[in-house]
Amino acid sequence: MNTQLLVTLLAMSIGGVALAAEIKMDDQSQLTQKAGKGAGESYFQPPQEKDLPANAYGELVQQGRAIFVDTQKYAAEYVGNGMNCTNCHLEQGRKANSAPLWGAYPMYPAYRKKNDKVNSYAERVQGCFQFSMNGTPPAADSHVINALTAYSYWLSTGAPTGQELPGRAYPEVPQPQGGFDIAKGKQIYAEQCAVCHGDDGQGQKAGGGYVFPPLWGKDSFNWGAGMHRINTAAAFIKESMPLGKGGSLSDADAWHVAAYMNSHERPQDPRLIEGSVEKTRLKYHANDGVNLYGQQVDGALLGQGVK
């Protein structure tokens, strides 16, 4: 992180002590929000690239954007699957209701139940590499983390610190009465999703890289990623999928297809305890939203992982 940015962040953190009572420090592991904006609310508007300064800071922001959009290329040594950051945080981390960076950065440091401690923003990004990217977290002072932090900081220009902005999460989608139906989800997947992600959920490649990410299997996110939760995946799908047709699926259909997606095997949770899926389920998954880790589906135990 360059000196000017570090000084700015330090000043912000010191200045924020007096406002600590106003800043919500609740669990940031699993964000929820009601769909849409409240009366009189509007979404935060991040700055445009044309407004970037032509200096070292602007260059670092551009490098962070490049890593975010093409993580496979610019942070390859830390990625263990076929995902890019922008696969989950759409429109280069700008899109409201898709966990935008401008909604996340101002909320850190924050407590996360996932690792039971207050996390810095760098630690939050490291977690994405470990779970969503099924890779190795870059060091907190690495160029990759510094660049991604600078990009997030820049997108948050003008955003209030410690305030939950409208659009910062995936809007919560209520579970259908009677629960999800994996068989229905399979049919919906074939009709709505397979054209991009493939009949087998393995995505599509062009020029050696994925243009549509794999949704399960060895090149997808692992069992520790937030998207393995059916409720989180349903919220993402309802809001933004199929691509360009967000909101076209019913709440129930979003749940059904999310359950189908997450009823397939994927890379192991890196927090695996003593080689035991059951011990790992009890410690990390039993109270983590709605998920199928450690559950039997069609006679198979999910959570054994693929390599």
Swiss-Prot record:
<feature type="binding site" description="covalent">
    <location>
        <position position="85"/>
    </location>
    <ligand>
        <name>heme c 1</name>
    </ligand>
</feature>
<dbReference type="InterPro" id="IPR009056">
    <property type="entry name" value="Cyt_c-like_dom"/>
</dbReference>
<keyword id="KW-0408">Iron</keyword>
<keyword id="KW-0560">Oxidoreductase</keyword>
<keyword id="KW-0677">Repeat</keyword>
<dbReference type="GO" id="GO:0042597">
    <property type="term" value="C:periplasmic space"/>
</dbReference>
<keyword id="KW-0349">Heme</keyword>
<comment type="subunit">
    <text>Monomer.</text>
</comment>
<dbReference type="GO" id="GO:0020037">
    <property type="term" value="F:heme binding"/>
</dbReference>
<dbReference type="Pfam" id="PF21342">
    <property type="entry name" value="SoxA-TsdA_cyt-c"/>
</dbReference>
<feature type="domain" description="Cytochrome c 2">
    <location>
        <begin position="180"/>
        <end position="265"/>
    </location>
</feature>
<dbReference type="InterPro" id="IPR051459">
    <property type="entry name" value="Cytochrome_c-type_DH"/>
</dbReference>
<dbReference type="InterPro" id="IPR036909">
    <property type="entry name" value="Cyt_c-like_dom_sf"/>
</dbReference>
<comment type="function">
    <text>Catalyzes the oxidation of 2 molecules of thiosulfate to tetrathionate, using TsdB as an electron acceptor.</text>
</comment>
<feature type="binding site" description="axial binding residue">
    <location>
        <position position="89"/>
    </location>
    <ligand>
        <name>heme c 1</name>
    </ligand>
</feature>
<protein>
    <recommendedName>
        <fullName>Thiosulfate dehydrogenase</fullName>
        <ecNumber>1.8.2.2</ecNumber>
    </recommendedName>
</protein>
<dbReference type="GO" id="GO:0050338">
    <property type="term" value="F:thiosulfate dehydrogenase activity"/>
</dbReference>
<feature type="binding site" description="covalent">
    <location>
        <position position="193"/>
    </location>
    <ligand>
        <name>heme c 2</name>
    </ligand>
</feature>
<feature type="binding site" description="covalent">
    <location>
        <position position="196"/>
    </location>
    <ligand>
        <name>heme c 2</name>
    </ligand>
</feature>
<feature type="signal peptide">
    <location>
        <begin position="1"/>
        <end position="20"/>
    </location>
</feature>
<keyword id="KW-0732">Signal</keyword>
<feature type="binding site" description="covalent">
    <location>
        <position position="88"/>
    </location>
    <ligand>
        <name>heme c 1</name>
    </ligand>
</feature>
<keyword id="KW-0574">Periplasm</keyword>
<keyword id="KW-0479">Metal-binding</keyword>
<dbReference type="GO" id="GO:0046872">
    <property type="term" value="F:metal ion binding"/>
</dbReference>
<feature type="domain" description="Cytochrome c 1">
    <location>
        <begin position="59"/>
        <end position="156"/>
    </location>
</feature>
<dbReference type="GO" id="GO:0009055">
    <property type="term" value="F:electron transfer activity"/>
</dbReference>
<dbReference type="Pfam" id="PF13442">
    <property type="entry name" value="Cytochrome_CBB3"/>
</dbReference>
<feature type="binding site" description="axial binding residue">
    <location>
        <position position="197"/>
    </location>
    <ligand>
        <name>heme c 2</name>
    </ligand>
</feature>
